[in-house]
Amino acid sequence: MKIKKVTETSIKDTPHRVDTRLIYDNKSAQVVHIILQPGESLKPHITPVDAFFYILEGSPTVHVGDEKQTVEVDTLVESPKDIVHLISNNSNQVARILVVKAPKPEGKARLL
């Protein structure tokens, strides 16, 4: 059994400039833990694989294509591959999001 604590995982240096930690990385999937402080946002980008966002804390706004929705804890949002998406935190509370990409992307996300 492998156990990994998010708090003991290093923060990745990404163009998004937010707290992003890769907590699972396998050829079948990739899992990223993101913390968005109030006012922070991911940059619009396109991922070459399907992904979903699971809200652990806070109430971030999820943008997928032309749609956007502010979502609550324990909500799952699907994001199909090759569609522009981003997550923003317009609230006054921290937002924590689990991002699952399957299968693991072979290339990097494309920033817009």
Model feature map: region roles:
Residues 1-28, 77, 108-112:
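A short, N-terminal "cap"/entry segment at the start of jelly-roll beta-barrel domains
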